[in-house]
Amino acid sequence: MADALGMIEVRGFVGMVEAADAMVKAAKVELIGYEKTGGGYVTAVVRGDVAAVKAATEAGQRAAERVGEVVAVHVIPRPHVNVDAALPLGRTPGMDKSA
């Protein structure tokens, strides 16, 4: 099973909560956290199978647009291990899910 990282950046905390709720309800993904980036921008981050993360971010975008402003939506399929080493977003570097 391929792993992916999905992010939705919105303006405002309520929009982020709405997006996060929709993402975890829409597909089998794990909400691994959120990041406040300043200026009212907040990013929700999910992990899971590539197809599930794509479906989740699409659902999250639709939900967040109903209550706020979506700034960006992005999915990184199979992020390189160095991404986890530099930005430990819910994974321990070197961790193999199939083990």
UniProtKB/Swiss-Prot annotation:
Biotech relevance: Artificial BMCs can be made in E.coli by expressing (Hoch_5815, Hoch_5812, Hoch_3341, Hoch_5816, Hoch_4425, Hoch_4426, Hoch_5814) or (BMC-H (Hoch_5815), BMC-P (Hoch_5814), and 3 BMC-T (Hoch_5812, Hoch_5816, Hoch_3341)). Cargo proteins can be targeted to this BMC. Artificial BMCs can be made by duplicating this gene with a 16 residue linker between the copies (making an artificial BMC-T). The shell assembles into balls with holes where the pentameric subunit would be, and can be used as a model to study assembly and permeability.
GO cellular component, one term: bacterial microcompartment
Domain BMC: 4-88
CDD domains reported in the protein's UniProt record: BMC_CcmK_like
Pfam families: BMC (PF00936)
Keyword annotations of the record: Bacterial microcompartment
Main localisation: other
Disrupted-gene phenotype: Absolutely required for BMC formation; when deleted from an artificial operon (Hoch_5815, Hoch_5812, Hoch_3341, Hoch_5816, Hoch_4425, Hoch_4426, Hoch_5814) being expressed in E.coli, no BMC shells are made.
Localization terms from the record: Bacterial microcompartment
InterPro entries, sorted: Bact_microcomp_CS (IPR020808), BMC_dom (IPR000249), BMC_shell (IPR050575), CcmK-like_sf (IPR037233), CcmK/CsoS1_BMC (IPR044872)
Subunit record text: Homohexamer with a small central pore. When purified protein is examined by atomic force microscopy it dynamically makes uniform patches about 35 Angstroms thick with hexamers in the same orientation. In the BMC the concave side faces outward, with the N- and C-terminii exposed to the cytoplasm.
Family stated for the protein in its record: Belongs to the bacterial microcompartments protein family.
Function of the protein: The only hexameric shell protein in this bacterium, it forms the majority of the bacterial microcompartment (BMC) shell. Expression of 5 proteins in E.coli (BMC-H (Hoch_5815), BMC-P (Hoch_5814), and 3 BMC-T (Hoch_5812, Hoch_5816, Hoch_3341)) forms a 40 nm artificial BMC with a molecular mass of 6.5 MDa. There are 60 BMC-H hexamers per BMC. The shell facets are 20-30 Angstroms thick (a single hexamer layer), with 1 of BMC-T trimers protruding to the exterior.
PANTHER family associated with the record: BACTERIAL MICROCOMPARTMENT SHELL PROTEIN PDUJ, PROPANEDIOL UTILIZATION PROTEIN PDUA
Protein name: Bacterial microcompartment protein homohexamer
